[in-house]
């Protein structure tokens, strides 16, 4: 099967590599190819994954049966508008980006007007651990037709129905909790560390929620997700804010999550720290670089 990925970051890179390993013809396109400074690393990544790096978006979309969009939330609609002028009848555009239902519906209108089909896809867990087995929710007028193709590829998809936006709504509402827990942990332990009471706080959390791992790897994992992906998560949470506002639900917590996720990234950038310099990730050491112990 001819498959194209627009966006060759973490999720797109993993899925593209695994699908290529199955014998599919996988092509990738990323706007980093347009920047001289980032092109060599992109070429190396494509070579390592044994996928074809397209010369242009038009080149990437030609002859593709399935087109997966795995860009950032802020670029999701721009990609739709650029791709729509190049898509043809019979092609399926699968939008895996974490954006508001309203954004997905607007994207669907653009793709449908171009004659292609639009599939709303919600990625319901981090991609690295389960890779192709990562749970996906799919919806859209052609979702029932596309599901067998995804099953053939080994993707773990669940059909919701023909309505665009339902899968996205589930993902957006879930993100309030998931990204919120990351932000709460970052803020909580940043302060606790400054007061020298972090172990007592973690002991108390473990006593209240003994099955979650507060006394083990959970704090490292939650804060590492912000350190590594806070920029993208902040953009996604801005879409969550829109999701809530569209149905007149106050988005105070979601707006605060945006600030906390982005805040940690900004603090690391201000100190010229990159996530690769922080691995293996130990939350205490990372926060000490931002907030020197009192």
Predicted feature residues:
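The conserved SAM/SAH-binding core of class I Rossmann-like methyltransferase domains
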Residues: 6, 29, 69-70, 121
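NAD(P)+-binding Rossmann beta1-loop-alpha1 motif at the extreme N-terminus of oxidoreductases
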Residues: 1-62, 87-90
